[in-house]
Amino acid sequence: MSDVEEQYQEEQQPVVQEELQVVELATTIPLDVQEAQREVKLFNKWSFEDVEVKDVSLVDYIQIRNPVFVSHTAGKYASKRFRKAQCPIVERLTNSLMMNGRNNGKKLKAVRIVKHALEIIHVLTEQNPIQVVVDAIVNSGAREDSTRIGSSGTVRRQAVDVSPLRRVNQAIALLTIGAREASFRNIKTIAECLAEELINAAKGSSTSYAIKKKDELERVAKSNR
């Protein structure tokens, strides 16, 4: 054996030993722990894998395919029109909580509210709270609305179908408005009111502010057909 081959084997020996140590370490870690480390969970608690959108028309507009740890992407979906449809749905709910004047720009506060609300939902329903949020948004979007047609002289209202993106936008807005109004001058926190609103909307209950508004919009549209 030449000197070059001996030197090459001496250099490769510590590398092989390190690889063996890594393999031994990997085999000592339980499989469930390894899988949990690989999976991306919201707030490192809830998985996106089993979440499904039950309305076929909204599958492309409720983003749950790309999981995130925290509902904050620094506004990269606001640069182009209609790109917000690709924004994670929990982040869209978080951003909608900042719409009121005194809450403008308080993203960290909104993230904490949503996290606390999801924890409450998980305790009360024993379900994946992301699935509850998706069901609430699907149930809260009006399928039919009315619009004004005509000039200033003769104006009439005509029933029209609502696009899927507007359904999602309207549902998120109604859910957050209902939670904000319920928490105003109330002993309950806004996180508790948001959790209650999402649970009732996911069930389709008429006690939900968003469901009541949706039914009202559809009733007016039906009378203007």
UniProtKB/Swiss-Prot annotation:
- Keywords tagged on the record: Cytoplasm, Ribonucleoprotein, Ribosomal protein
InterPro entries xrefs: Ribosomal_uS7, Ribosomal_uS7_CS, Ribosomal_uS7_dom, Ribosomal_uS7_dom_sf, Ribosomal_uS7_euk/arc
| Matching PROSITE patterns | RIBOSOMAL_S7
Q: Where in the cell is it found?
A: Cytoplasm
Does the UniProt entry include the keyword Cytoplasm?
yes
One annotated Gene Ontology cellular component of this protein: cytosolic small ribosomal subunit
Q: Which domain of life is it from?
A: Eukaryota
In its UniProt record, a GO molecular function of this protein is: mRNA binding
Q: Name one GO biological process term.
A: ribosomal small subunit assembly
UniProt KW Flavoprotein keyword: no
User: What does this protein do, in the record's words?
Assistant: Component of the ribosome, a large ribonucleoprotein complex responsible for the synthesis of proteins in the cell. The small ribosomal subunit (SSU) binds messenger RNAs (mRNAs) and translates the encoded message by selecting cognate aminoacyl-transfer RNA (tRNA) molecules. The large subunit (LSU) contains the ribosomal catalytic site termed the peptidyl transferase center (PTC), which catalyzes the formation of peptide bonds, thereby polymerizing the amino acids delivered by tRNAs into a polypeptide chain.
UniProt family annotation? Belongs to the universal ribosomal protein uS7 family.
PANTHER family in the cross-refs: RIBOSOMAL PROTEIN S7 (PTHR11205)
Q: Give the multimer and partner information.
A: Component of the small ribosomal subunit. Mature ribosomes consist of a small (40S) and a large (60S) subunit. The 40S subunit contains about 32 different proteins and 1 molecule of RNA (18S). The 60S subunit contains 45 different proteins and 3 molecules of RNA (25S, 5.8S and 5S).
Q: What is the protein's name according to its record?
A: Small ribosomal subunit protein uS7
State the organism's lineage. Eukaryota, Fungi, Dikarya, Ascomycota, Saccharomycotina
